[in-house]
């Protein structure tokens, strides 16, 4: 007779199994996947720790374990990722939102009035992916006008769904567009433009963790030979879409500050070049003000 698997015994076994296979945060990963399987919360796993799993639940959980052993990111397995204390649906069509990217949200919110204004600001998010940045901004300052673009139609559709999930469908305008292509500068000028563009050098991508180089969309990672191709494009084009005195905020690689400073410094359109550090102390966000 096979032993009965309870929640707590399964958590202990899975933690050990993940640990032996070099999976990061083995206990937390086991909790997240088991809670997802049972459609409950991680806290409830411990409240119901002696509850046995059914055969179908065990089969489903074992499938999720194997996916994680194959180094598929937890966010893709569960289809969900928290960002800015909001829950986002994620698929392999979009980059998984990272905590470091919350720095660009913080820096942008500092530029936006907290109270309702008779003259709402216009904000544009380039390469929106799951919509994490623009939705986080709109959730905090819903009285402004928001636009977001992505070259991937699948990403744009997913971002719209995430906006609807958070009641922001009427607040954010999503466009399928390669950077600025679908935006007419004669009709739209923005107070703030934000972006988390691809900035990883092409030859570095194969050296990244399997969770990244096997599963996340290459189009959202690959910044060409030096990682700066899309950053250059945005820096070059943004002045045509920014109001005078408007701001451009870009996420950059942790080691790209000097290179990005040279590119930005060669433009006559910007002043007040500033770099903002992430939670690990790396210069993560470039902040520019248009003359």
Which sequence ranges carry the predicted segments?
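Residue-level signal for inorganic ion chemistry
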Residues: 33, 71, 101, 133, ...
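Non-catalytic accessory regions of SAM-dependent methyltransferases
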Residues: 1-38, 43-46, 50
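Conserved SAM/SAH cofactor-binding pocket of Class I
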Residues: 103-207
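Conserved AdoMet
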Residues: 34-111
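Mobile active-site "lid"/loop adjacent to the S-adenosyl-L-methionine
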Residues: 199-230
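Helix-to-beta-strand junctions that scaffold the AdoMet/dcAdoMet cofactor pocket
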Residues: 168, 216, 242-244
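Conserved Class I SAM-dependent methyltransferase catalytic core
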Residues: 225-288
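Conserved hydrophobic residues forming the short capping helix/wall of the S-adenosyl-L-methionine
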Residues: 18, 112, 163, 238, ...
């Amino acid at each position: 007779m096979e032993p009965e698997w309870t929640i707590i015994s399964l958590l202990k076994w899975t933690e050990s199994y993940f640990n032996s296979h070099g999976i990061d945060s083995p206990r937390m990963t086991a909790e997240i996947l088991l809670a997802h399987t049972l459609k409950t919360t991680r806290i409830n796993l411990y409240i119901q720790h002696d509850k046995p799993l059914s055969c179908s639940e065990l089969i489903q959980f074992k499938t999720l374990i194997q996916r994680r052993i194959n180094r598929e990111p937890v966010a893709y397995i569960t289809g969900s990722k928290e960002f800015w204390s909001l829950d986002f649906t994620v698929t392999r069509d979009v980059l998984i939102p990272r905590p470091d990217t919350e720095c660009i949200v913080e820096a942008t919110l500092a530029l936006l009035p907290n109270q309702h204004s008779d003259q709402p600001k216009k904000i544009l998010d380039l390469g929106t992916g799951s919509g994490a940045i623009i939705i986080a901004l709109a959730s905090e300052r819903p009285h402004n006008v928001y636009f977001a673009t992505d070259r991937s139609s699948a990403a744009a559709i997913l971002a719209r769904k995430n906006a609807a999930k958070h009641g922001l469908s009427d607040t954010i305008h999503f466009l399928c567009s390669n950077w600025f292509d679908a935006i007419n500068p004669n009709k739209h000028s923005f107070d703030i433009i934000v972006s988390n563009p691809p900035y990883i050098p092409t030859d570095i991508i194969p050296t990244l963790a399997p969770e990244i180089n096997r599963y996340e969309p290459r189009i959202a990672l690959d910044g060409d030979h030096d990682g700066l191709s899309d950053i250059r494009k945005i820096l070059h084009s943004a002045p045509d879409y920014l109001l005078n005195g408007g701001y451009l905020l870009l996420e950059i690689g942790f080691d790209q500050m000097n290179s990005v400073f040279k590119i930005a410094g060669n433009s006559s359109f910007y002043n007040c070049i500033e770099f903002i550090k992430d939670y690990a102390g790396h210069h993560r966000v470039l902040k520019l003000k248009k003359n």
